[in-house]
Amino acid sequence: MSMLDDLPGWGAIPTPVGEFRLRPVRLPADLDLLAGWMNDPEIAAFWELAGPPDVTEQHLRAQLDGDGRSVPCLGLLDGAPMSYWEVYRADLDPLARHYPARPHDTGVHLLLGPAESRGRGLGAVLLAALAERILWRRPCCERVVAEPDVRNRRSVRAFERAGFRSDAELDLPDKRAALMIRARLPLPA
């Protein structure tokens, strides 16, 4: 079993906006698409991966060739690529040095690629759906966490609308981040 409980096999997630699925990134096939998104000024301001495709490729290869604690994925909505996600073991990530991590905390990073996908509420819908799927498929995980840049108000609001709560602000090496947490809801008594 992988560190993320076979994320590629999690299947499609029905949402109000269509069928959502995560597919692990494939190189070199997905590189041009992802490098194009990383060079969009709105995305580049927060992801810092703008530049030639090899900048994006190095970032992806580090995860793909790693030990499985981070899985880079394309987000497909009704079969069309429209987002990029990183699902990772936050408790095993350097992030864990900056907050009181719990075993199996699972982190998410995301970006909505095409400009027409942004500003329509898609991020919140997909975040909520993925957080639920993570908590369902990873019973050992009690929390889904994220750390968007505090300046990225649209992202922070999307996490809030998806049921995450802002827990703290963290001074990370590359940004001041809002620690967002979506905890597993307790079972009714």
Residue ranges of model-derived segments:
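Short, high-confidence coil segments that cap the C-terminus of an alpha-helix
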Residues: S70, P139-C141
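Conserved acetyl-CoA-binding loop-helix of GNAT-fold acetyltransferases
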Residues: G119-I134, R157, R161
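Conserved beta-strand-loop-alpha-helix junction that forms the acyl-donor binding cleft
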Residues: V144-V156, P173
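C-terminal "cap" of GNAT-fold acetyltransferases
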Residues: H104, L172-A189
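Acetyl-CoA-dependent GNAT
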Residues: R61-G107, L111-A115
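An amphipathic alpha-helix signature
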Residues: P28-A35, E57, R61
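Conserved N-terminal entry element of GNAT/NAT acetyltransferase domains
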Residues: M1-P28, P188-A189
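Helix-loop element at the rim of GNAT/NAT acetyltransferase active sites that forms part
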Residues: G36-A50
